[in-house]
Amino acid sequence: DILADAISVRIGRDGTTEWDVDMYNNDAALTMLDYLSGSALLFPAYTYDEEGGFVAQNVRGNYTRDDEQTIPDVKTGELYLFSGGQLRFYFKDMEGANITATPIGYYTDVEGLTEAVQEAYTSNMDDTWGVDVYFWITKTLE
């Protein structure tokens, strides 16, 4: 079951492009949605992994692992929650990734997504807080 257009995301501190994200109707995704509101939340990602094709941040909360699965190939725009609480957003296709995680959601349009993340990372290299990439996240699900 899919929660269409559950959130919208702007990539980078000064990002203006709105990206729609569909989320899965599972306990982990619903718990994350509970933390969000209709106001934009500035979300920091402290890990940028060009080789792994993802940005990540550890999130707190009691997330169930009921929907955890093994995913052989990861696609651009997919979001996963790992057992240690790491939330990953993949900005590149990663064939043979073989990850075990809970699918959270996916960007509905991935055209230009890779470049947007890379540009946000490059423009944020001197961040005083050590953040690699910022995301503005707004809950759009009613």
Where are these regions (language model features)?
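A structural detector for beta-sheet-dominated domains
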Residues: G12, D22-Y24, Y134-T140
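N-terminal low-complexity, Pro/Thr/Ser-rich intrinsically disordered segments
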Residues: D1-T17
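Short amphipathic beta-strand/extended segments with alternating polar/hydrophobic composition
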Residues: E18-N25, T102-T108
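Histidine- and/or cysteine-centered catalytic micro-motif in compact active-site loops
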Residues: D14, Y24-N26, Y48
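Glycine-rich active-site loops that engage anionic ligands at enzyme catalytic sites
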Residues: L33, S37-E142
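Second-shell loop/turn segments in exported
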Residues: G15-D22, Y63, D67
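Extracytoplasmic/secreted envelope proteins and their assembly/folding machinery
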Residues: N26-L33
